[in-house]
């Protein structure tokens, strides 16, 4: 491989390690298929495969064969990989902050429309998704329930153009879109408690057609993403 190839693999390796550090992929999670992961990362399958092999070699991932096989996360954030996370954040931090701020405004706008346009069917669906989130186990199950609830809010806006913009932005911001980063085991309980509280407030505002409240709550809620990234960045710089 050329030096450029190796440099790109280095960058993708750092990105995948950071994905584990910020809880995009939680311990025990299976990563997307190689082809899908390469598309999310914006690189070729050869580069993605080489980066995955590095993570397997470092013990962060393990390969399982068979119909239910794939690449699985083995542990949360090994202290030996702090430098990789620090490098990624140093390179990407301005763009991440910019994207996160844009995300708060996009989700605020979608929540305002949902509060204006929701139907009785939307109300029933939102309340069911909220209950599903509350009942889900901590970790990956609740991360997935969070994603499904936010998709229901987007659908309740009944605006295809803005919905497409929001979903496209999510894909640019995280490689697990439409799911969101879920932090580490130390920060997760407080984050999930806050998310549950704000979900309840947001769904109530949408159901009650409180447009301004829905927008304000959604913007504050989506700030969680940047807060999780900043916490991981600070840990990487101080460990």
Q: Could you tell me what each predicted segment is?
A:
Residues 211-239:
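C-terminal effector-binding regulatory domain of bacterial HTH transcription factors
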Residues 1, 90-97, 111-115, 134-137, ...:
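A ubiquitous short alpha-helical element
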